[in-house]
Amino acid sequence: MASGRWASPGPAWASRRPLQAQVVLKSASPGPAPASQQASSFGSAPAQLPPAFVDPELSPAMLLSPTCLPVACTGPGLAGEQPLQAPLLPPRGISRPSSGLTAASRDQVPACLPAACVRPSSSVTVACSGPTHASGTLSRGVSPCLTLASLTLREFSVGPCLTLASLTLREVSMSPCLTLVSLTLRAILPHAGLLRPSSCLCWPFQAQPLPVGGL
């Protein structure tokens, strides 16, 4: 009898086994979380996202973007400080009073007046070594910005080439930028050995104006 009971547990034991299995399943998988926990978990999800995706208007990428671009990144058109190029003089070598040649510091413009090979029938382009050098020869303590308001060019030709004879300085205005109303340089090029009757004249011209006190 006893051995028969242990061999066949009976219907009572068979009915208890599913109940124990259900209890084990309940303890292993607690089921869906409460609504409050779901809300808190979903509410905290945006806080864990990167700051750029939380709010586009307040993202660091928008806040750190510069409202004004640097001069080096922008082009000369946007920066407003584009280096001015020296305009060519008329073919006859006489400039108009309204034409001005402006140059700033050496960092902005490499040469205030570029040099060129001068011919009688072509336009004349005067050059100098740099704005700081030109302003240093004129006066001490003057800003390196050099503005040429008007140039008076007098030329004569020796053989096939043009010789720059004189460039006269008449008025000098001492301001933060040195303004030359009209500049005249009296340079005798054959004296320096730079001019030959049979060769074209090409030289890096350096302006050496007259002293201010002597005018």
Swiss-Prot record:
It comes from the Eukaryota. It holds the Pfam family DUF4705. Signal peptide: none annotated. Residues 27-47 have a biased composition (Low complexity). Residues 25-48 are annotated as: Disordered. InterPro entries: DUF4705. This is Putative uncharacterized protein FLJ46235. It comes from Homo sapiens. The lineage of its organism: Eukaryota, Metazoa, Chordata, Craniata, Vertebrata.
